[in-house]
Amino acid sequence: MEASPVPSSQGSQLDSLLGRELLARLLQVSAVSLRRYLAGERAVPDPVAARLHFLALVAGDLAGAYNDIGVRRWFDRPRTLLDGRSPAELLEAEWKPEDPGPRRVRDLAGALVWSPAT
């Protein structure tokens, strides 16, 4: 799962979970482009597919600790472990999953899988 992005299925699931506006913002694409990707009207560029897969993994980690509303809010809430920044703030322009900011976001979400408390 870690290295197998499937934009069509992950995109529709994340769109349903996060909502079009938040998902487009996190992917750093316009809502119109996202709609076209999800409808299959336009091919998903590789960098966007990688971001989509990354967000699906993060959302999967969060699902064990938060309900759908909590998952959506998690991305915009400042976190002490992120130096007071929100996860969305660390997903900076043209981010790649292997960049330091996104790695910190993934590590924080992944830590919830092992935490007995939220």
Positions of predicted regions on the chain:
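Non-transmembrane "mature" sequence context
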Residues: 1-118
